[in-house]
Amino acid sequence: RNYGGIAYDYYGYNISVIDLRNPLFSDGNNMLHMVNKYMDQYKQNRNDLSLKAKTEKYAKIIAKTIIFSDGESASSYGQNSFFYDSAEGLLTSIILIISEFCDDGERHIVSVFKLVQDLLKPSGIKGKTQFQILLDYLPDNHKAKWFAGAALNTGEQAMMSVLSTVLSRLN
């Protein structure tokens, strides 16, 4: 099932296997490493906005890589492009939230996966999703809200579709 060894031995490729369903069978690689690195540096020096920009840049790269893993862009999905664009923004914002607010041992892609699963649960508040409730705790100028833009301002059903898109891409 894991052809990484064959690709390395015979073709010289260095392959990393990331299996979110079975993390113990994955290679030891934290996809959020660069995001966490620059977030930690930014927390030490809040005046250096270039560190914050690098954090956001790497979060966006990870989200784009996961959502558009087939190499296509959102425009090639036709009527579904809204959901894929929104899913990318939502995933970027969740990565930033995990990196900023979780403890060191919890800042990895599995925590992102788990948070997305938790956000799919009903909120109990009519007209509000779990994601909207989560982002209400953040200041108005927090970048996670900016990245979530389109997904944050949709109805409950559309938001569930966006979350399902993210979850399907993380699987």
What would you call each of these model-derived segments?
Residues R1-N171:
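P-loop NTPase motor domains
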